[in-house]
A protein has these predicted regions:
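Class I S-adenosyl-L-methionine-dependent methyltransferase module
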Residues: 40-136, 142-143
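Short helix-loop boundary/capping segments at the starts of domains
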Residues: 17, 33, 57-61
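Glycine-rich S-adenosyl-L-methionine
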Residues: 165-176
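A short N-terminal beta->alpha junction/helix N-cap motif
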Residues: 2-3, 42
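A generic secondary-structure signal
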Residues: 13-17, 126, 176
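Conserved proline-anchored active-site loop of SAM-dependent methyltransferases
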Residues: 11-12, 24-38, 44-49, 92-95, ...
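Short helix-loop-beta connector
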Residues: 17-23, 147-148
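Conserved alpha-helix/loop element of class I SAM-dependent methyltransferases that forms part
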Residues: 3-20
Length: 176
């Protein structure tokens, strides 16, 4: 299913109906497309340190580049230092937003080259205002310290689709 940005308007009214000031916790924050539409105390965690680096970088004033060419993309893929820039390139300049899943390229409906990097930059900067106040934490869901009486929204990796870097046990998750 991927990003929840399009369906958040349908899910959130149901989920927030009885929230009553409780902390909103997302152990699998991913693209932050639910947490950015929630007010109040929020914790967004992810085991992928690059996800957390990108969002904390944005919170601290990191401005992504408007353009990254294919050679710069390849260099970033080899670098792998955990910085907001490498994180942005790894997600924002990759095919379908998949972590270094291939340099994103293509054309618009009018045949003009698309600038996926600029599109990603605009999207995350638009989202940035709604991420203020979110506490982003690099943690597995198992080790995340969740405040008592929190409302927890889990959107774990999907079973049988994309292979994740460190693997993910759905059996362990359902026992959690």
């Amino acid at each position: 299913m991927g990003s929840k940005n399009r369906i958040a308007k349908h899910l959130l009214p149901i989920m927030l109906e009885n929230r009553n000031g409780r902390t909103w916790v997302e152990p699998f924050v991913g693209g932050a497309n639910m947490i950015d539409k929630v007010d109040g105390k929020r914790i967004g965690a992810d085991f992928n340190e690059y996800v957390i680096s990108l969002f904390t970088g944005i919170q601290n004033g990191f401005i992504p580049p408007s353009e990254v060419n294919e050679e710069e993309y390849k260099q970033a893929r080899l670098n792998r230092v955990v910085t907001p820039l490498i994180s942005f390139i790894g997600f924002g300049c990759s095919y379908s937003g998949k972590w270094f899943g291939g340099y994103a390229r293509g054309n618009t409906n009018k045949g003009q080259p698309r600038n996926y990097c600029l599109e990603s930059k605009k999207n995350i900067l638009k989202q940035s205002e709604n991420l203020k106040g979110v506490e982003f934490i690099h943690s597995s869901y198992q080790n995340l310290q969740i405040p008592s009486n929190s409302l927890i929204y889990c959107d774990p990796p999907y079973e049988g689709t994309t292979k994740y870097k460190d693997g993910f046990s759905h059996a362990e998750f359902w026992e959690w």
